[in-house]
C-alpha cells in the first residue's frame, strides 16, 4: 500500500487529493479538499494545511497538475504569482518524489482512469486498439494533445495547437476573422481566440456590432460590465457562461447565434486535429465548456463540421468521439502519474 498526493493547481482553485494504491485494487481516494489559490502565497502552506487536516503520514509520491508550462521541473502559474520548483517542494514538504505536469497533459493521463458514466459518446465510430488518442478542450484557452500506447501505458504529448491559425470556411467566418484582425490590430488570429471561453464573448461582440440580432438587456449589461473591466485580473461577471445559459434556455437570439457559430468552429477544429492524428483510439472533448452546453453540441452541427472534410469524411466518421463529463479528470491524471513515479 502506497500513499500518494495528487493536485490540480489553478489560478483560481487548488484541489488536493490523497490516494492509496495497491497492486490488487488500483487507486482509492481517502481524502480531498479544495482551496482558493489566491488566499495563499505559495503551494507549500496549502499542502501543509491539507496534510495536517488529513491526519495521515507524509505521502511517498506527489504529482501536481499545473495551469501553465513546465520548464526543467519548474512552473510559473499563468494566472497566479507562484513559482514552483520540484526540488524546493520536495525539501519543504518532505515528500521524496514530486512531479509537475501541465494541466492538459494531466487530462490526457486521466482518460485511462475514467468510467463509462464519465463520458458522453457523440460518435461511436470504429475504435481501433493501439492507435493514437486525441484530446481537445476549450475552456479559458484551447488545449490540444495526443496519447500514444507504450507498453501497457499511454504516453501523453501536449501541444500548442490552439495557437495555430483560425481558418475561416464561409462568409460569416471570414467576416469574423476580419473583425478580430481589425479590433486587435494584429496580423493573424489563432483558433484559440474563437474556440474558447473568450472566443464565445468575441463571437457575441462580432454579431452584436454587425447587427445580426438585437441584444437582450440582461446579457447586454453583463457583456458591457465585462468590457469595462478589461485589464482587471478579477472580473465580477462571466459573460461566456451567461451567453451559454441564455442560448440553452432559448431566451436570447444573439446568444443562440453566438453558440451556433462557436460550436461549428469547435467541431471544425476538432476535425482538423483528427485529420492530423487519425485517433481511432478516440477523440476526447475536454475542458469546462462542452459538458455545460452538451444539448447544443448534440444539436448544433458539431459532428457535421467535424466530419465535413471533403473526401476524408469517411475516415472521420469512423473515429470515436467522446465528451468528458467528469470535471476532475485532471486530478485523476495527476494521481495516475504519481502512481507511475
UniProtKB/Swiss-Prot annotation:
Keywords: ATP-binding, Cytoplasm, Glycolysis, Kinase, Nucleotide-binding, Transferase. It is an enzyme of class 2 (transferase). It is found in: Cytoplasm. One of its GO terms (biological process) is glycolytic process. ATP binds at residues 7-12. GO terms for molecular function: ATP binding; D-glucose binding; glucokinase activity. Gene3D superfamilies: 3.30.420.40, 3.40.367.20. It catalyses: D-glucose + ATP = D-glucose 6-phosphate + ADP + H(+). GO terms for cellular component: cytoplasm. Its main location: cytoplasm. Its EC number is 2.7.1.2. It holds the Pfam family Glucokinase. NCBIfam families: glk, PRK00292.1-2. PANTHER family: GLUCOKINASE (PTHR47363:SF1). Belongs to the bacterial glucokinase family. This is Glucokinase. It comes from Nostoc punctiforme (strain ATCC 29133 / PCC 73102).
Amino acid at each position: 500500500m502506497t500513499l500518494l498526493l495528487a493536485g490540480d493547481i489553478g489560478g483560481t482553485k487548488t484541489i488536493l487529493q490523497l490516494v492509496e494504491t495497491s497492486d490488487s485494487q488500483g487507486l482509492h481516494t481517502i481524502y480531498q479538499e479544495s482551496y482558493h489559490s489566491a488566499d495563499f502565497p505559495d503551494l507549500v502552506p496549502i499542502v501543509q494545511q491539507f496534510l495536517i487536516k488529513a491526519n495521515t503520514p507524509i505521502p511517498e509520491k506527489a504529482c501536481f497538475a499545473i495551469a501553465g508550462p513546465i520548464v526543467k521541473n519548474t512552473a510559473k502559474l499563468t494566472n497566479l504569482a507562484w513559482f514552483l520548483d520540484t526540488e524546493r517542494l520536495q525539501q519543504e514538504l518532505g515528500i521524496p518524489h514530486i512531479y509537475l505536469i501541465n494541466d492538459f497533459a494531466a487530462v490526457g493521463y486521466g482518460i485511462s482512469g475514467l468510467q463509462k458514466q464519465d463520458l458522453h459518446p457523440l460518435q461511436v465510430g470504429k475504435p481501433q486498439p493501439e492507435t493514437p488518442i486525441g484530446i481537445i478542450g476549450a475552456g479559458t484557452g484551447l488545449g490540444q494533445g495526443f496519447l500514444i500506447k507504450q507498453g501497457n501505458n499511454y504516453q501523453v504529448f501536449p501541444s500548442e495547437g490552439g495557437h495555430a491559425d483560425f481558418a475561416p470556411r464561409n462568409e460569416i467566418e471570414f467576416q469574423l476573422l476580419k473583425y478580430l484582425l481589425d479590433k486587435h490590430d494584429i496580423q493573424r488570429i489563432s483558433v484559440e481566440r474563437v474556440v474558447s471561453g473568450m472566443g464565445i464573448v468575441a463571437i457575441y461582440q462580432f454579431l452584436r456590432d454587425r447587427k445580426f440580432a438585437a441584444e437582450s438587456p440582461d446579457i447586454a449589461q453583463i457583456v458591457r460590465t465585462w468590457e469595462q473591466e478589461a485589464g482587471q485580473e478579477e472580473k465580477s461577471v462571466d459573460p461566456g457562461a451567461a451567453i451559454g445559459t441564455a442560448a440553452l434556455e432559448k431566451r436570447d437570439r444573439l446568444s443562440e447565434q453566438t453558440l451556433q457559430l462557436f460550436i461549428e468552429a469547435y467541431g471544425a477544429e476538432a476535425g482538423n486535429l483528427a485529420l492530423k492524428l487519425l485517433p481511432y483510439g478516440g477523440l476526447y472533448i475536454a475542458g469546462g465548456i462542452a459538458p455545460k452546453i452538451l444539448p447544443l453540441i448534440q444539436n448544433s452541427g458539431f459532428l457535421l463540421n467535424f466530419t465535413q472534410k471533403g473526401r476524408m469524411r469517411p475516415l472521420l466518421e469512423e473515429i470515436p468521439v467522446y465528451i468528458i463529463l467528469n470535471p476532475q479528470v485532471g486530478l485523476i491524471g495527476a494521481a495516475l502519474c504519481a502512481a507511475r513515479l
